[in-house]
Swiss-Prot record:
Similarity comment: Belongs to the isocitrate lyase/PEP mutase superfamily. Isocitrate lyase family.
Protein's organism: Mycobacterium tuberculosis (strain ATCC 25618 / H37Rv)
Gene3D superfamilies in the cross-refs: Phosphoenolpyruvate-binding domains
Xref: SUPFAM superfamilies: Phosphoenolpyruvate/pyruvate domain (SSF51621)
Lineage of the species this protein comes from: Bacteria, Bacillati, Actinomycetota, Actinomycetes, Mycobacteriales
Name under which the protein is recorded: Putative isocitrate lyase subunit B
Cofactors required: Mg(2+)
Cited function: Together with AceAa, they could catalyze the formation of succinate and glyoxylate from isocitrate.
């Protein structure tokens, strides 16, 4: 029993006996919810309702005072600290928007501009919260609407480092240095600054310090011409610039003003599903293909196309998607393209690409999928440096 509850019991007993109590129990509870123990005890003595209550007797062997935790306690403590705090943080046992809202509304009722913090804790098992995937995705956004301006994960970095190291060590044991090559490919794909490691570990700064301390007479540098970092600047994959050059030819033929830009990224961070997007000068997304490169049991590379869109009606029926598919097949060395849950547009497109010689076979009778086999001799013809065949494809001469 808290001191406030003990006093409330005394007041209720006195009230039931018809004694003058000086303050209604409900009024006392409202006062005690915000008052310190010293202020509450002084008020209780003033009311003649100071019960025998000793917080020292309930201390734990370690010396901790016992409290009744919960949202009301967190609110009371935070309201007391609010005049002196830049930001307030309430720790919870699980992720719950209702709890967060109760706390936020109580604080903002008295301090409307008070900033709040929320721990998106890895201690929570987020799959036991009862939230759907979409609710989890929007959870930080909903917190922001309540005034939680600082949302953090206490030891997320520790877990990320642990899982990444564990996965990489296991991959090294299973696949040798192919594991590192795959990691480097991913870093190049997302254009991570970690792909040039010497820069991030302080190579340029070390060289600058050495030059300064030696009066610029030092001849040994970490970042000289022989630095292994320069290996990571070599273009090892088919560049996006190639598709941008094709799109420039395409735009010129159709007299389109936008200079088109190509972006290739994971559809969502960490996902194996990729998105190739075509953007205009205003950064509007004009077209995209969502796909995943996989290998079958025979080691053949297959592009699984999950979705594709041409967002501007003026860009359709101009073989834009054909150019995009040509580049994807070239970039990922695909032997086949599979369209999952295909649309009528996919049916039309694959039949046309077969007529252009890009596909040798198109099977549309394999459940909810279209299987298209790539015609590599035709692909090689379209990729010749003179671009004669490619230009004819763009201009519909052949």
């Amino acid at each position: 029993m808290t001191y406030g509850e003990a006093v409330a019991d005394v007041l209720e007993f006195g009230q039931s006996e018809g004694e003058p109590i000086g303050m209604a129990p409900e009024e006392w509870r409202a006062f005690a919810a915000r008052a310190s123990l010293h202020a509450a005890r002084a008020k209780a003595k003033e009311l003649g309702a100071d019960p025998p209550w000793d917080c020292e007797l309930a201390k734990t062997p370690e010396g901790y005072y016992q409290i009744r935790g919960g949202i009301p306690y967190a609110i009371a403590k935070s309201l007391a600290a609010a005049p002196f705090a830049d930001i307030l943080w309430m720790e919870t046992k699980t992720a719950d928007l209702a709890d967060a809202r109760q706390f936020a509304e109580a604080i903002h009722a008295e301090f409307p501009d008070q900033m709040l913090a929320y721990n998106l804790s890895p201690s929570f098992n987020w799959d036991t919260t009862g939230m759907t995937d979409e609710e989890m995705r929007r959870f930080p956004e909903e917190l922001g609407k309540m005034g939680f301006v600082f949302n953090f994960i206490t030891y997320g970095g520790h877990q990320i480092d642990g899982v990444a190291a564990e996965e990489f060590a296991t991959a090294l044991r299973q696949d040798g240095m192919l594991a590192l090559a795959r990691l480097q490919r991913k870093m190049r794909l997302v254009e991570s600054p970690y792909r040039t490691p010497q820069t991030l570990v302080g190579g340029p700064r070390s060289d600058a310090a050495l030059a300064a301390s030696s009066g610029r007479t030092a001849t040994t540098k970490a970042m000289g011409k022989g630095s292994t970092q320069h290996q990571h600047l070599v273009q090892t994959e088919v560049p996006r610039k190639l598709l941008e050059e094709w799109l420039a030819m395409w735009s010129g033929h159709y007299q389109l003003k936008d200079k088109l830009r190509v972006q290739l990224r994971p559809q969502r961070a960490g996902s194996e599903v990729l998105e190739l997007g075509i953007h205009g000068e205003s950064d509007d997304k004009l077209a995209n293909v969502i796909f995943q490169p996989i290998q079958d049991r025979r080691g053949r590379t297959i592009l699984l196309v999950r979705d594709q869109n041409t967002f501007g009606a003026e860009l359709r029926q101009k073989r834009l998607m054909t150019l995009i598919h040509l580049w994807l097949v070239h970039r990922f060395k695909a032997q086949a393209v599979h369209y999952v849950t295909p649309t009528d547009d996919n049916l039309y497109q694959t039949s046309k690409m077969k007529s252009h010689g890009i596909f040798t076979e198109v099977n549309q009778e394999v459940g909810e999928i279209i299987v298209a086999e790539v015609n590599h001799p035709r692909i090689a013809e379209l990729l010749t440096p003179d671009r004669v065949a490619l230009r004819k494809l763009i201009t519909k001469e052949a």
